[in-house]
C-alpha cells in the first residue's frame, strides 16, 4: 500500500527567530560604536591633512613672493590651493555659525583665522552661536624686522581636543 508522506512545515520556530534577533542585536551593539569611532578617526586625519595642505600653500606663496620681490603678507591660503576642497565655504567674517555648518571650513579675515566646524565632538576650541570651531591662525615668521614666512598655529586660548 501507498503511504502518504506527512506534511511538515519548513519554517523557523519562534525560538530560532528570537535567537537570530538577539544575535543581530549583539552584533549591532558592537559594530555601531566602532563605526562612529572610525568616522571620528577619519575626520581627525582629514583635518590634519587639510592643515598640512594649507601650510604647504603658505610656503609656496612665500616662495613666490620672494621670487617676485614682493612683500609677504597674511592672506587666505585657500586662495593658493590648486583644488579648493568642496567643504570650504569661503570667507565668514563677521562670523555667522550658520555659514559654516558641521564638517566645513571657512576663513575669517579678522585675525587671519582658518576655521573648521567639526562633525565629531571636541572640548575647547572657539565657540560662536553654540557651535565649537577649531581655529588655526596665520602667523608671520619674522627675522628681525623681515617677515620670512607664514605658518599656521593654534592659539592657546582656543586649544581643543577631540572627545
Predicted features, each with a name:
Residues 40-69:
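Membrane-proximal N-terminal amphipathic helix
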Residues 63-122:
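Extracellular/periplasmic head regions of type IV pilus-like filament subunits
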Residues 113-163:
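Short, surface-exposed interaction loops/tails
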Residues 18-34:
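Alpha-helical hydrophobic helix detector
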Amino acid at each position: 500500500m501507498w503511504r502518504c508522506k506527512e506534511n511538515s512545515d519548513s519554517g523557523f520556530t519562534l525560538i530560532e527567530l528570537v535567537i537570530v534577533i538577539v544575535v543581530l542585536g549583539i552584533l549591532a551593539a558592537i559594530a555601531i560604536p566602532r563605526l562612529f569611532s572610525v568616522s571620528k578617526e577619519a575626520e581627525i586625519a582629514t583635518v590634519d591633512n587639510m592643515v598640512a595642505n594649507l601650510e604647504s600653500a603658505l610656503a609656496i606663496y612665500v616662495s613666490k613672493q620672494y621670487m617676485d620681490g614682493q612683500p609677504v603678507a597674511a592672506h587666505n591660503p585657500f586662495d593658493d590651493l590648486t583644488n579648493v576642497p568642496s567643504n570650504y565655504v569661503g570667507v565668514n567674517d563677521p562670523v555667522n555659525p550658520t555659514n559654516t555648518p558641521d564638517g566645513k571650513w571657512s576663513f575669517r579675515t579678522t585675525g587671519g583665522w582658518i576655521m573648521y566646524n567639526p562633525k565629531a565632538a571636541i572640548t575647547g576650541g572657539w565657540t560662536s552661536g553654540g557651535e565649537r570651531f577649531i581655529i588655526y591662525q596665520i602667523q608671520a615668521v619674522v627675522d628681525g624686522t623681515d617677515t620670512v614666512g607664514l605658518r599656521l598655529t593654534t592659539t592657546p586660548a582656543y586649544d581643543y581636543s577631540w572627545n
